[in-house]
Amino acid sequence: MDEADGIILITLKDLGCEIEENETIKNFDSEMVYKCILAYLRVINEQKVINLTNTLPKNMSARVNACSLIANIIKDSGYRSELSYHNLLYPNVNDIRKIFIFLGQLLPKKEVESGGVSIQKLEDQICQYLQGCVKESWIPYFCPFSKRIPGNYSTATLFTTTGGNLRIPSRGRQLKVTPGLEQYYSQYLEPLTLQTNRFEDIAPSVFEYNLSIYAEAQERDNEWNDKGVSSGMNPIDYRKNKQKQVLSKMNDSIRQSIIDGGNNQISSNCNSGDSFLDIISEFRGNSLDVGGQFNRKKAFTNELNNNNNNNNDSTTNTNKVETEIETEEQRQLKRQAEIDALQSQIDEISESIQLHNKEMLDFLSLMRQSESENLEQDQQREVLEKQYKIKKKTFSLLDDAEGNMKELQSLCNQTSSNLLEMSGEWEKVRKPIIEKYRSLKDKQNNQADETKSKLDRIKEMRILIKKLVSEVQQKDDQFQQLQDQYKQAPKDSNRSQYTRRILETVKNIKKQKVDIDKVLLDTKNLQKEINTITDTAVRTFELVKDLLYNDAKKDQTAKQAIKSFAIIDDKFQKLFKTIDETGNFQNNILNLNSKIEHVSQKTNTLNSDRVVQDLKNIKSENQSLIKQIKTLIETKN
């Protein structure tokens, strides 16, 4: 019972009942029993107890009504034992335990865990796997990338698409890294069947897409086998290093193209055939680029050459050396002037770059605005073209209005007749399809029921297996404990003691058997004596009766003897009945004593003082209600 009480307490805690750790079912009062049963019923069927309060009412009549309603609900659920409101108001441990066990069996089954994985987790894993399979692009069975059927695929036919590259939704880390990519895939990306111009190009496009992915993967594997293994890095670091190298090369090439394009003149309007260098030089924003880096270097070197030439001329002309010799301070001043001029040129160039960048941004915004306006104008043009075509057709039909009306009427009649024929044909096709659908649906429902029943059986078997495993483990532990105790027990015990005890128990059993046989023999002998005595008494009574009747004809005293004998017979019969009744009464007394003991065991927790107090409360409530009724009647009169 302690194990059952422990399971019940755990279940009640799971249902949300506030139970202390050291509390047991024996300590439950009527308030606690009401809360616990209400928690059970709310999980089983909340609609039936939706009107009941969370706590037991203080009013006695309301208590009786609430407990009666709960008792009726439990009986309707299939409870077979006797149950009434007094079983809940004055709880008994055995009755409450039975009720809790019954309600626990009606609770909805929880998830049965097997191997540490619940059914809900298994269903989530299946859903994730199926979602991943749906998101993946279809791969033909003969494609090596699918890794399904090994073999030689050199004879596989490759297809090319005329509808452009396909856009397949990607998954994994790219969705988390790229913001808005998942929204684009779910809301704006067209389905695979609409990305091609023709329906016939869908399969070839898919084949080409899959083979291109396989080719890229093969190239990556070949590159890794050729270069990556010798680099001493793992594949992830090798890819990152390669990406960095590619980005650095691109940056260097762009930077070099910008530097090389600094000396070129940039036209204001770029044609569609302009090169990448021209576009970059245009974005630099200076057509002449007077202050370019290489122009400045060239000018600076030319000035140095001129200065060197002048110095050579001064050395040749010995007469002008003294007048043209420059001091160190003058040189520094000249260099400072050159540096200031270069700095001013740099500032002008940076300002011009900023201005041209602003102009470029304005140009881009204007270009986007013009593109949006062009799209709107194209849409308006398409709408106007449709309206123009409709109006053109209507105006062309106005010349012969009556004839055209007749033709339209005939076309309408023909279309209506075609629709009727098609509806009839559709009904012919629809009926077998519906019947087949219904049969398949019924079959599916039956299969679902069978699978459900099988799953329930599997769950029950798993529970049983777990119980058996736990029992086996307990038995193993018990066996191990007993074995340890046996090993630790003293080995000097004498075998004669055990044999003597066994012999004593056998002797006691034999003595008890002899006593039982004696009692049975005495009862048999007593029954025989009773039977013989009753037989002799009946025979003597009949004999005496016959003798008295024979003597009564001759002797007057015999008649008086017959009367006294009849009185004795009547008293004897009464005595016999009283003896039988006393025996029956004694048997009934024994039965009633056993029942009283049984009932006392049930009602050992029943408090008579509490019942008397409740009775007094009910009487006081009844008196107050009677007074209220009288006052209401008097007020109405």
UniProtKB/Swiss-Prot annotation:
Coiled coil: 322-489, 608-637
Keyword Cell division: no
GO MF term (any one): cullin family protein binding
One Pfam assignment: CCDC22_N
UniProt keyword annotation of Coiled coil present: yes
Lineage: Eukaryota, Amoebozoa, Evosea, Eumycetozoa, Dictyostelia
Protein name: Coiled-coil domain-containing protein 22 homolog
Family of this protein: Belongs to the CCDC22 family.
InterPro entries: CCDC22, CCDC22_CC, CCDC22_N
Keywords carried by this UniProt record: Coiled coil
GO biological process: positive regulation of ubiquitin-dependent protein catabolic process
